[in-house]
């Protein structure tokens, strides 16, 4: 069918043979398919689980038995990686932002992350709150006061002099660069690709599923399993780094409250063990709702602590600093993104300690955060999803870092003890609160918040890894979930041990090494995502509409001058709206052929939602799945 100027086909012309489509539905008319409406058969992927588990257990055993050996090898590999592949980390962060901005403002922006009928499950406020909760953690406390202070005292190479008004704004811009759009652009890329793949294309929720447009059925073979194994390993190390930071920060709080002279690695390991017990209890006892409530309380306490510092700290100074730091961040963004080996050895050292670690950390967190964001974003348009996911959480974190960092820098300017650069990063937080009201209470609140972040992060990340090792099962076996949680704790311990006296060094080095290969996965994912969108039913309709109107207007002017109107009727072969588009190609139609649990084709009526063999989905409560578990 085509839109033309109104000319009928010659009576002598035979109609072309009707094309055959799955379920007699043109690819431009498919309303979308949700993974929930598919007849998937889940089970433990023994290859993904077995190989990944063996590698991780071997690494943990090596790290515990010979931490010096791990430290030596990782340091050597780290030096090589920073010299030769540091540019890759910068590049992938820009890819995330660029891809999502392109999608948001292109013709793909109107495509839904779901079927045509799907509406958002959550209000916009609740959606943003949950999204923000997924992307923040202990880092806002560990680095919030200390990072801006550090950059203020020792600015990045080739920028400004330290302890000056210029370094104040440079310090906050650098912190915003690390925690703002770059991180959330990458989360949006992975979350958007997963949500589209699962709720628009009906694929199982696996990282490998997002590559279907490029690799076809190979995503269900060795190539797909390799991608999922890399995603699990990245998540393990990224979350383990977070757990290690939590332990370090909690240890500092325990030291302050107890009056202990020093917190050793043995004490940090004991803290990890205690918090691990809390994670295991939450995983196996069915208190998931309680954990969610606790997580919501934690977010409220976090924002409350930020507001507390804003009110009791240098409020007027902070009000002036917020817009200044945001504008400085915007003006310096490309300059900061362009720093690499070409700027010299000092820049490489700065990148290794700060920027590269953050990029690696965010890359390693993308499977975890991306999968969570995907699950709560169903029914949103890609334009709304991309813009809000990148902008709102970034702005909230920018506010938090400006308030914490601006307060710490103010205390340095006022010569308050502990803010001259001599204190450790974990100590600066407690030093800041010690100079504000209610210090008899705030250390306990901070320890509680940090501990809950530990448990909830471990719990959520373990479920994600359980899903990835169970063929996309959204409710994986609890023993698998606990196993991955214990592996995270083991890696966190190894990271602390390999860091020696500076535990943070071990966390940073290993996180960067693991993230570099997964960065390549994310670049290819961006390409696959765009290719997927190019054959979306909505994109096909837009293509036909553009061709039909263009053809009809030209033909109308040629044959009727000013006096013509558009109508819909059969067009001559080769002159229709779809003349240059093969709507029957396998890569256009294969995805919406419905199958049963064994993968056999089954007819389906998209209008009525009925299967030809009479199958109907069982009525299940939230969190349950119609699946066969190993």
From Swiss-Prot:
GO molecular function, one term: symporter activity
Keyword Cell membrane: yes
Source species, domain of life: Bacteria
Induction, per UniProt: Expression depends on the external osmolality. Induced upon hyperosmotic conditions, resulting in an increase of its transport activity.
Keywords carried by this UniProt record: Amino-acid transport, Cell membrane, Ion transport, Membrane, Sodium, Sodium transport, Stress response, Symport, Transmembrane, Transmembrane helix, Transport
Major site of localization recorded for this protein: membrane
Region called Disordered, residue ranges: 1-28, 611-630
Family: Belongs to the BCCT transporter (TC 2.A.15) family.
Protein name in the entry: Betaine/ectoine transporter LcoP
The gene coding this protein: lcoP
